[in-house]
UniProtKB/Swiss-Prot annotation:
Record-annotated membrane-spanning stretches: 16-36
Superkingdom classification of source: Eukaryota
Tissues expressed in: Expressed only in the egg apparatus, consisting of the egg cell and two synergids. Not detected in the central cell, antipodals, and nucellar and integumental cells.
Subcellular location: Membrane
Membrane topology according to the record: Single-pass type II membrane protein
Gene that this polypeptide is encoded by: Ea1
Ranges facing Extracellular side: 37-94
Stated name of the protein: Protein EGG APPARATUS-1
Induction: Rapid down-regulation and/or degradation after fertilization.
Post-translational modification remark: Possible proteolysis of the C-terminal region from the predicted transmembrane domain to permit secretion and transport of the mature protein to the cell walls of the nucellus, allowing the spreading from the egg cell apparatus to the micropylar opening of the ovule.
InterPro entries assigned: Egg_app_1 (IPR039926)
Task performed by this protein: Involved in short-range signaling required for pollen tube attraction by the female gametophyte. Required for female fertility.
GO CC annotation: membrane
Amino acid sequence: MSSCPAIVNMKDDDGIGAMGAAVAFAAMGVFGIYFLWPVVGPTSAGMMMKAPGAAGWVICRAVFEANPQLYFTILRTAGAAAAAATFAACSIAS
């Protein structure tokens, strides 16, 4: 028996590196679609509208139509940013 540690072959294989890069790129694409689709999807489907009384803000049309009185109450008491943030999520309506 020898007291020397075993020699390990550390050969760099370019095929594995390219495959790993492709898998990482695909994973980033899936990650991006998963987290960005809820933001981009409803606006492209036409479910969003300009927030009344809050210039520059966009809110979910279905949520606003379900309870416009609540929107205007929040707009008067807490301001445009709070009202738009409350009515921004379209997942509540679906």
